[in-house]
Amino acid sequence: MALLEIRNVTRRFGGYTAVDNVSIDVEAGEFFTLLGPSGCGKTTLLRMIAGFDLPDSGQILLDGKDMVGIPPEKRPVHTVFQTYALFPHMTVADNIAFPLKMAGKAPQEIKKRVNELLERVHLPNFGNRFPHELSGGQKQRVAFARGLVNRPRLLLLDEPLGALDAKLREEMQIELINLQKEIGITFIFVTHAQDEALALSHRIAVMNRGNVEQIDEPSKIYSAPRNHFVADFIGKISVMNATVMEAVPSHLKLAIEGLGEVTAPAREGMEVGDKGVLAIRPEQVRISHPSNESQLKNHFRGKVHDFLYVGDVTTYIVELANGAYIEALLPNSAPGRAKFFEVDDEVTISWRHDAGIFLNDPE
């Protein structure tokens, strides 16, 4: 039995459905992420798990017990917010100890647990400091410690890294992974940042307009998206209109509108005549000078429309003969690289037969 079972949960606000008949199972010890754009329902769902809001229908079961109607303070759940929510008039130690004091724990136990958590979050000598004396990353660590001090069954994290700068956010991701491994408590993490979800999670639920589009491991979410929304939301894709010409267990043969035929990975349920798009990620696309004609079967000529230099790689936007645009990444440390391609340069783009994915759902 899963630790957390969300069964057909719906939440409406007037005529607007924020969460629409959602069902999710979360296993004990799992780092599970709710990922989606603003307004997709992820925070509303988190609030219902915490008890700050109630579903209009459905069940939320924790260890098999229905949580609907149980107030937040009575649930074995704690929430860490993006704003830290630290008490400014309390020291770090008192902030961490607050949930234990409210629970009536003995002073000796409180001191022991607080010191243990300060060690775990790498702030052993910060107990007597006040929040205004801490950096953003230190405040976030204190918030994590306070969330863990009463040993909840679930720790809910509502975009906790959103207020941090990029470098600190990356450092905190590593700390969060290590902390979850050490403690073994189930984390449910809410974010709109795809890179965070991919880096942190055991599994991800991608949400859109109140629905769950796909639940899977990060690698499968990225490489085998279930539909166009998931493919487009997770990372970058280029799409080309395509029709299935051949569908066999080993591969699909697709006719790309206005260009020619390519080979793509097989997908269950596809039939000859199905129309959709071939979605391909920039890192799967090779770009070369036309004189170095690709040995790959999937290749077309094009012209550089634009490019974006971002330090370690350059992203090239190539216009194909049918007017479609496809992005390609080229490492700036590529062996033998003499110069960048320039706008209007003629190029060849190519990709392996096992790259890309055919999607035939509406965008």
Swiss-Prot record:
It is an enzyme of class 7 (translocase). Keywords: ATP-binding, Cell inner membrane, Cell membrane, Membrane, Nucleotide-binding, Translocase, Transport. The keyword Cell inner membrane applies. It is a peripheral membrane protein. Its EC number is 7.6.2.11. Residues 4-234 form the ABC transporter domain. SMART domains: AAA (SM00382). It comes from the Bacteria. GO terms for cellular component: ATP-binding cassette (ABC) transporter complex. GO terms for molecular function: ABC-type polyamine transporter activity; ATP binding; ATP hydrolysis activity. The keyword Nucleus does not apply. It catalyses: ATP + H2O + polyamine-[polyamine-binding protein]Side 1 = ADP + phosphate + polyamineSide 2 + [polyamine-binding protein]Side 1. ATP binds at residues 36-43. Pfam families: ABC_tran, TOBE_2. Part of the ABC transporter complex PotABCD involved in spermidine/putrescine import. Responsible for energy coupling to the transport system. Belongs to the ABC transporter superfamily. Spermidine/putrescine importer (TC 3.A.1.11.1) family. The complex is composed of two ATP-binding proteins (PotA), two transmembrane proteins (PotB and PotC) and a solute-binding protein (PotD). This is Spermidine/putrescine import ATP-binding protein PotA. It comes from Nitrosospira multiformis (strain ATCC 25196 / NCIMB 11849 / C 71). The lineage of its organism: Bacteria, Pseudomonadati, Pseudomonadota, Betaproteobacteria, Nitrosomonadales. The gene is potA.
